Amino acid sequence: LGIHFDFHAKATDTNIGARTTPQMVAAILDKVQPDYVQVDCKGHPGYSSYPTRVGNPAPGIVGDPLRVWREVTAQRGVALYVHYSGVVDRHAAAARPEWAAYNVDGKPNPKAMSVFGPYVDQLLIPQLRELAGEYGVDGAWVDGDCWAVVLDYGGDVVRRFCAHTGAERAPRRPEDPFWQEWKEFNREGYRVYLRRYVDALKSSHPDFEVISNWAFSDHM
């Protein structure tokens, strides 16, 4: 039995965590008796609902609600997991457009990170390691991941595709040459990205559990 909180903090949210007290968390655990709890830590808007040092904390955070959840769940032997938005990160797309996937019109996608770019190494992995190491969280459920991947027309991605396949350009329509190869190239890019962060966490924090929502399903 588990509890899943799916908050998705935004820049406009205020007093995040103001009512998250040890007494409140204990009351929930005593009433529900869950085996695990999953709380939000970074939703699709890209803001973190705890005072992260490596990510982008929401401006309306009060205290450290994640620390409260971890301390009380640990005292009661209840596993604590976090919801983490992977490919979807609107804040990062706005602040670091070079991290985003590029649409066919040459503009950065407003929400989808490039699975070929530095986002995984510069934000995703460091933040998951912060959660595992600094907070002692048991694992992360990565949402907004495989189902959010888009065809990436970034210049470097297209050059790599052309070198890999011999195509002269990236196809834009299903009737264009190399369309299936283009889709599969982007799918494989996601698989490489997924393996990269799973392997990184297993290397540094082997007990930290990682799951990517809808991975290896019909959404992938």
Which residues are covered by each model-predicted region?
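N-terminal structural segment of carbohydrate-active enzymes
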Residues: 1-45, 76-78
